[in-house]
Amino acid sequence: MLKKQTVWLLTMLSLVVVLSVYYIMSPESKNAVQMQSEKSASDSGEVATEKAPAKQDTKEKSGTETEKGKEDGTKGTKDSSADKETSAEASEKGTVVTETADDDLFTTYRLDLEDARSKEREELNAIVSSDDATAKEKSEAYDKMTALSEVEGTEKQLETLIKTQGYEDALVNAEGDKINITVKSDKHSKSKATAIIDLVAKEIKTMKDVAVTFEPSK
């Protein structure tokens, strides 16, 4: 009985082995394997297709960054334009300052003249106070100091007189027999200059030469 069972088991095992070999070697099995491979490839394609939008997102992101870069570039251009406008405005302000300096021309003239007169007065005073100077030198220096004070008084008087004629400002510089007059006025003519000369002649009888110059107020 045991031998029969053993033979039966061996027979069944042999049959299973034969069927397995037949199944593997049959065309249908190959087709099944091919279909399985195609299915796997198809699944892989789906995965690849699903991952593709990620690249598209990257492109969209790059596009967004590009647009942002353009906006930044445009903003930078606007900033540059603003800087140019600011630079142009600063340049115009610099021109205004130059014009203001022209308005201060009379102040500069006066300061220069006062400095020159102050140095001259110091030199004359040094001679008067010097122990080495002779009596004649001291007397001459003193006379020059007195004359200088008189000239300064005459200049102030003439400046005030000219401004009463409607002029904004006037600068008078008397050097010996010559008087240089600078008048601040936007309008000037030969007749106006002649009128100023006649006005000065009435105040200074001994004058020989008078020069009148007009400077614009702006």
UniProtKB/Swiss-Prot annotation:
Keywords: Cell membrane, Membrane, Sporulation, Transmembrane, Transmembrane helix. Residues 48-92 have a biased composition (Basic and acidic residues). The keyword Membrane applies. One of its GO terms (cellular component) is plasma membrane. Residues 33-99 are annotated as: Disordered. The chain crosses the membrane at residues 7-26. Interacts with SpoIIQ. Residues 33-43 have a biased composition (Polar residues). This is Stage III sporulation protein AH. It comes from Bacillus subtilis (strain 168). The keyword Cytoplasm does not apply. One of its GO terms (biological process) is sporulation resulting in formation of a cellular spore.
